[in-house]
Each structure stands twice: as structure tokens, then as C-alpha cells.
């Protein structure tokens, strides 16, 4: 029996021959490689360490000990004296286990890792904050002036019976009312570090952040008025004594009179917001408190005429609180540098936008100009991206971080539904699915009890917001909805300023309780409508070609209306597109659930949308956890 002799093969050829893998193995390898997700840029990612004042430096992943530790070294590490114990031995012994805990990936939110742009706050810290603020149940616990405390119930929150401070108000108001240890105006030290106090207010949407910083600011303005009057009295006495001494020495010399110092165009408090819409909203709240507290306020934006801006800012009576956008204020400060010479408090509302690439140079310029007189710098936002978190740790390492337990979480009273537009009867038609959802909501009855005077003044008007990702689609979607008998309007950057104000007023202002005269007029109008006339109009028998959805108003908008706008009358939000990031999810659904009211969000999911992301957002909302 003879054995088959294999042909001789060169060893060099055998080593150079490619290794053939089964097709299934190579396909799995390719799919795993393509499934790797690119890391999101810092401005689109939420920071994981918002509440931490400092972060420990991470260890280098390079092995210092082992069989390959001596390779690629640029320095000769010659062992001289014997070491007591190596780092590896210390790690094995567990002596440093408490100092360097090993991080473990949570199985929750696997799909959201591509959108992890928010900074998570440890739940231990959230629980500690919750227990800390549990004892504060009334605004009487805060050391506010009596006139400021009275304005909360009469002007800021009128018509509410049981008024209690929200978590961010319980945290922020006492801290913002604390004085600096030295009690001096803010200046810059020799090494460049700011001496003024810095605060970061981070809380969920609709939690009352505006009132949380506005009440301490108004209180500070009234206290500074008393302080300035005392300083003026002392200054007048000093000048009078100096004048008497000069007259005694030189009785016949004429001295020019000094012009009186005016506070026109020199505000004490400046509130910066990114958009003109927020200028109008915050300015209304500031002006409402001024009715009882008595201070001078104003708001300026690009929607106003130059004459109106000049008369507001340079009022001869002076101005105490100014609400503006950064670019407009910076342009005014270039020609009128004294505008920023008396600022003691500076607020950056929606700080994640104001510290972004588009606003950062202008915002930094304003901060540097007000630094000589600044006492407190307040940053306020509902989402803290990683880019903002890193910037604050670099520029303001000593900033006081005031974070609420529900930061980066959507309110529990908001329910999220999903509509698959690929199924029947839509077959991928997103416009048709949106119109069908709106008709279903409009024809359904209200789940919440109606207003006590609804039977007198007429039916309740349902307000619905529809968010799109591109502003070009806002007009197209609104036009399609109008063709289906829906009262829809569009709002984007292309809309005029007058139209923006009129539209936002319908979706932000809640109707006050009707007066007896309004009730009588409504009843009279209803009786006239129910009466049978002697002569019918000519077009009475002509049927309408299009069905109309009654008692429903729809606003199709972009992210222009997703940040800071207080849409209290809105109970339904439709996400026409799946948001790009977790930040957009939080801000768009944050238009609901304000002041502990119920809300409903509906997402239209198509073939190319991330259904796993929407699923995990729903799970996080059900558990009441942050979307990180």
C-alpha cells in the first residue's frame, strides 16, 4: 500500500498565502465593522458629569508592567532602589479599589449611545438633592422682601390657589440670595480668574427656571436701590464739605458745576436670551413683577424699530433690568460703552445655545466687559451638552452647580405614542398620517375636566404643535393640513416678526376666567345663533366642499418654538420627524407637562427612522429616568 505524496510547497509561499475564511464569517465581520457608530460631536452630546464640581483624571490605558512594557520607550527607566510594591500589586490587593472604581456599562439605552449628548447625574446625588429640598414647601421660607413675596401671588402666578416653589426654585433662590464672602463688586484677579460668583441652574423643561432666577434678581435690585441712596447721601455730604473748604480758601474763584450722573442706558441686571421670541416672553414676566415691586425694566430685540430700542434703553429715568439678545447688545456696546458699566448681575438663559459656536464669541465679549462691576453670573438651561460642560470646567472651575433630581428627564405626566406610517392605511405617506392623527385628536373628547365657565363662553379650543426637522417643510406640511380642513399655521425663521408674535400669542397665553359681562355677551350670542331667522342667507343651502375640523388649532414649527417658549395651553405635540438627538427630544416634548399638567406626544416613525431609539425613549419616560 503506497501513500499519496503531497506536492512540495515553499514555506515562504505558504506563509504569504491569504487565509480563506468562510463566507458567513467574513460577512459577520463586515457587518460588525459597518455597525460601529461614529462618536457624536461634543455640542450634540449631553455631558455625564453636570452636578460634579471636579472630575478625576483617567488612568492611561498603556500597560506599565508586563512582558511588553519595555517596548517603544523614549526614556530609560533603570531600576535603582527596589520599590516597595508595584502598582499592579496594589490593585490586586484591593487597597485602591475605593479610589478608582471600575466603570461598568449599563445595559439601558443601548441604541441611545449614538445620541448620548447629555451629561448624566448620579442617582445618588439626585436622591440627596430631593431629600434636601423636601422641607421647603412655601415661598415664605425664602428671605425675600415682603413686596417681592407678595408679587409672586399677585403678578407672577395669578389665579393659582395652592402655590408652592418648584425643585429648582427651592434650590436656586436661597443660593442666589447669598452675598459674596467679601461683599465687594466683582473684579478680575491678577491670574485672570473671575472673582464674581458663578451659578449653573440645570433643571427639566417647564420647571420654573425663569422665576427661580428672576425673584432673587428683583430682590437684589431693590436692595441695591437702598444701598445706592445711602452712598449718594454720603457722597453729597463729602462734596458739600469740600466745596465749603474751597470757598473759604478761594472765595472769588468760579468753579464749573459737575453735571448730574444719569443712569440712562446703564442697567443693573441684564438677561440674555438667544431669540427674539424669548425676549418677548421673558420681558413680559419681568414687566409683570414691576407693577407691584416698582422698578424700571425694558426689552430690546431685532423685531423692534431703532427708535423704540433707543427710547427703551436710554430712558432719562434710567433702567434696572434689561432683556436682550447678545448680538444686539454687543453692537450697542461698541458705540455706547457705558451701557455695560453698571451691570451687577448677568443671566444667560438657554446657556447651551448662548455658549455654542454661533453665540460664544459675542457672549464672551459681553462677560468680559461687565466683569469689573459684575457680582453674579447665572447660567440657566434644561440640557447640558458635553461641550458646555467641558467649557464650564475650563473657564469656571468653581461654578456652583444647582441641578434638580429630574434633570434631562421628560415629565412623567407626558405620554408618548408611536404611529408607524409604513402600515395601512398610510403606506409611507407622512403627511396623511399627521392629518389623520390630528383629526382623531380633534374629534375625540377631552380627557381632563373642562373649565368651570366653558358652558357659558363656548367650547375649549385644542392647541396642537407639530415639529419638523427642516424649516422648508413647515410651510408644506401646514398647507397640506389646511387642504384637509385643519386650521394650521406655520412658524419658522422665514416668518415675519409680526406674524411670529401673533401666532405664538395664541399658543402661549392661557385665557383668563371670563368676567360677568363676557358671560352675558356669550349667552346673548348663543341665543342669537340658535334663533330661527325670518329670511335665510343666499348661500345657506350651498354645501361646503371641504370638511372643517372645528375647535382645533395646529402650529407647524421647527426648533424655533422648542426652546423656552411657555406653551401652557398646548396638550398635544406631534413629532413629524424623529428628532436628531436626545436634546431635541427633551426640548420638543418639554412643551408638554408644564406646571404639572398632563400632555401627550406622538412620534411618526417611518422606514428609515430609528425605532429602537424611540422605544428606549418611551421606556425611559415610563420609568421616569433621564435620557442618558
UniProtKB/Swiss-Prot annotation:
Cystine residue pairs: none
Function: ATP-binding RNA helicase involved in mitochondrial RNA metabolism. Required for maintenance of mitochondrial DNA.
Keyword Zinc found: no
Region (Disordered): 51-109, 228-260
Domain Helicase C-terminal stretches: 456-628
Record-linked InterPro entries: DEAD/DEAH_box_helicase_dom (IPR011545), Helicase_ATP-bd (IPR014001), Helicase_C-like (IPR001650), P-loop_NTPase (IPR027417)
Family the entry assigns: Belongs to the DEAD box helicase family. MRH4 subfamily.
The organelle targeting sequence, given as a residue range: 1-40
Motif range (Q motif): 137-170
Annotated source species: Aspergillus oryzae (strain ATCC 42149 / RIB 40)
EC supergroup of this enzyme: hydrolase
Protein name, UniProt field: ATP-dependent RNA helicase mrh4, mitochondrial
Domain Helicase ATP-binding residue range list: 190-402
PROSITE patterns: HELICASE_ATP_BIND_1, HELICASE_CTER, Q_MOTIF
Keywords, in A-Z order: ATP-binding, Helicase, Hydrolase, Mitochondrion, Nucleotide-binding, RNA-binding, Transit peptide
Matches recorded under Pfam families: DEAD, Helicase_C
Lineage of the species this protein comes from: Eukaryota, Fungi, Dikarya, Ascomycota, Pezizomycotina
Gene that encodes it: mrh4
Catalytic reaction annotation: ATP + H2O = ADP + phosphate + H(+)
One Gene Ontology CC term in the entry: mitochondrion
Extent of Basic and acidic residues compositional bias: 92-105, 228-253
Enzyme Commission (EC) number: 3.6.4.13
Amino acid at each position: 500500500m503506497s501513500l499519496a505524496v503531497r506536492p512540495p510547497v515553499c514555506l515562504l509561499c505558504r506563509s504569504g498565502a491569504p487565509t480563506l475564511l468562510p463566507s458567513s464569517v467574513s460577512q459577520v465581520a463586515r457587518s460588525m465593522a459597518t455597525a460601529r457608530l461614529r462618536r457624536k460631536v461634543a455640542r450634540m452630546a449631553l455631558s455625564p458629569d453636570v452636578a460634579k464640581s471636579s472630575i478625576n483624571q483617567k488612568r492611561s490605558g498603556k500597560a506599565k508592567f508586563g512582558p511588553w512594557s519595555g517596548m517603544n520607550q523614549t526614556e530609560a527607566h533603570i531600576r535603582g532602589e527596589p520599590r516597595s510594591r508595584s502598582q499592579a500589586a496594589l490593585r490586586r490587593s484591593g487597597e485602591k479599589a475605593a479610589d478608582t472604581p471600575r466603570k461598568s456599562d449599563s445595559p439601558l439605552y443601548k441604541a441611545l449611545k449614538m445620541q448620548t449628548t447629555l451629561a448624566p447625574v448620579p442617582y445618588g446625588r439626585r436622591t440627596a438633592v430631593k431629600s434636601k429640598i423636601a422641607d421647603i414647601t412655601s415661598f415664605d421660607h425664602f428671605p425675600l422682601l415682603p413686596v417681592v413675596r407678595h408679587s409672586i401671588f399677585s403678578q407672577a402666578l395669578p389665579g393659582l390657589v395652592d402655590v408652592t416653589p418648584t425643585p429648582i426654585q427651592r434650590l436656586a433662590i436661597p443660593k442666589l440670595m447669598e452675598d459674596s464672602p467679601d461683599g465687594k463688586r466683582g473684579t478680575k484677579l491678577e491670574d485672570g480668574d473671575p472673582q464674581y460668583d458663578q451659578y449653573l441652574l440645570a433643571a427639566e423643561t417647564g420647571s420654573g427656571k425663569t422665576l427661580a432666577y428672576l425673584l432673587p434678581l428683583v430682590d437684589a435690585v431693590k436692595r441695591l436701590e437702598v444701598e445706592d441712596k445711602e452712598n449718594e447721601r454720603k457722597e453729597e455730604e463729602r462734596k458739600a464739605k469740600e466745596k465749603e473748604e474751597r470757598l473759604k480758601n478761594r472765595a472769588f474763584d468760579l468753579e464749573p458745576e459737575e453735571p448730574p450722573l444719569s443712569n440712562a442706558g446703564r442697567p443693573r441686571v441684564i438677561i440674555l436670551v438667544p431669540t427674539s421670541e424669548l425676549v418677548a416672553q421673558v420681558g413680559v414676566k419681568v414687566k409683570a413683577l414691576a407693577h407691584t415691586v416698582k422698578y424700571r425694566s425694558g426689552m430690546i430685540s431685532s423685531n423692534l424699530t431703532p427708535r423704540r430700542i433707543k427710547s427703551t434703553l436710554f430712558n432719562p429715568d434710567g433702567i434696572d433690568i434689561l432683556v436682550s439678545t447678545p448680538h444686539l447688545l454687543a453692537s450697542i456696546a461698541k458705540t455706547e460703552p457705558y451701557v455695560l458699566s453698571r451691570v451687577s448681575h448677568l443671566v444667560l438663559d438657554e446657556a447651551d445655545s448662548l455658549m455654542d459656536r454661533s453665540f460664544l464669541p459675542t457672549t464672551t465679549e459681553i462677560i468680559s466687559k461687565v466683569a469689573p462691576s459684575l457680582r453674579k453670573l447665572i447660567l440657566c438651561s434644561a440640557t447640558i451638552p458635553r461641550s458646555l460642560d467641558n467649557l464650564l470646567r475650563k473657564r469656571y472651575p468653581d461654578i456652583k452647580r444647582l441641578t434638580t433630581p429630574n434633570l434631562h428627564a421628560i415629565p412623567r405626566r407626558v405620554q408618548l405614542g408611536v404611529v408607524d406610517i409604513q402600515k395601512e392605511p398610510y403606506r409611507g405617506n407622512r403627511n396623511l398620517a399627521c392629518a389623520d392623527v390630528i383629526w382623531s385628536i380633534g374629534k375625540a373628547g377631552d380627557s381632563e375636566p373642562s373649565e368651570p365657565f366653558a358652558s357659558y363662553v363656548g367650547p375649549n379650543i385644542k392647541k396642537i404643535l407639530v415639529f419638523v426637522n427642516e424649516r422648508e417643510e413647515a410651510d408644506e406640511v401646514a398647507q397640506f393640513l389646511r387642504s384637509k380642513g385643519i386650521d394650521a399655521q406655520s412658524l419658522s425663521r422665514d416668518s415675519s416678526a409680526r406674524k411670529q408674535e401673533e401666532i405664538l400669542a395664541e399658543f402661549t397665553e392661557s385665557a383668563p376666567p371670563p368676567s360677568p359681562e363676557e358671560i352675558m355677551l356669550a349667552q346673548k350670542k348663543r341665543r342669537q345663533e340658535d334663533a330661527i331667522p325670518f329670511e335665510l342667507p343666499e348661500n345657506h343651502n350651498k354645501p361646503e366642499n371641504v370638511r372643517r375640523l372645528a375647535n382645533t388649532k395646529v402650529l407647524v414649527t421647527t426648533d424655533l418654538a422648542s426652546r423656552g417658549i411657555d406653551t401652557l395651553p398646548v396638550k398635544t405635540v406631534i413629532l413629524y420627524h424623529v428628532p436628531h438627538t436626545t436634546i431635541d427630544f427633551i426640548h420638543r416634548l418639554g412643551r408638554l407637562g408644564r406646571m404639572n399638567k398632563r400632555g401627550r406626544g406622538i412620534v411618526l416613525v417611518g422606514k428609515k427612522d430609528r425605532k429602537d431609539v424611540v422605544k428606549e425613549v418611551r421606556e425611559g419616560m415610563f420609568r421616569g429616568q433621564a435620557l442618558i
